[in-house]
Amino acid sequence: MPLWSTPAEPTAKRAAQAHTEVTGSTPTHTASAPATWSLIGEHIDHFGGIVAMCVGKLRAATAVSPRTDGVVAVHFYPAQGEPAHDSISLQALAELATARQPSTDAEGQPVIPPAPEGGLAARVGGIVYTMINRQLLSRETAGADITIASDIPEGAGLGADAAADVAVALALMGADADLDAPLRARVADVCTQAVNTFAARPALRARHSAALRSTGEGVCII
């Protein structure tokens, strides 16, 4: 059974250092979120069923700073492998969001939009776009540099993507203080909505909820 040790250096510190190196700017905010794993119920999460989740000690962290050119630039440093760099404009995100809206054909029959195909920039940029439109970020937001560092191995069932999503949202909000439970529930909903609108890999809502709301003690029932 594979085991992953907790790194000695905080993930948020590594994200901030990488952000400064790659963008030349000091991050305005950093945030992190834990790994998650499903105990039972993940197959009924989509239908609103009860899910039992746990969180781990490994974390993903995000550092952010503003841009003024309407672009979301993403720099991802995974637990294993080479860094990835991608970008997307807020205008392109708006067009992708429009394409995902349901419509009707000439006979009035519903037309189901195609599944999203977005990669790294679309997933992370989609969180920015959705937070703006759900009034969690100012409509004056004109782009962002976003650097993600993760200690959570991909494909291990530990919610590496969900942890990164949550860390991005918290950093964008400048969530230095504790958020109350209703706001945490709203942020989880926004993360899931964004990922399912823009990203090729769909989200498990319960992972976002657990990463935001679990105390880390015992099982989180969602």
Where are these regions (language model features)?
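ATP-binding N-lobe of GHMP and related small-molecule kinases
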Residues: 1-162, 166, 170-184, 190-199, ...
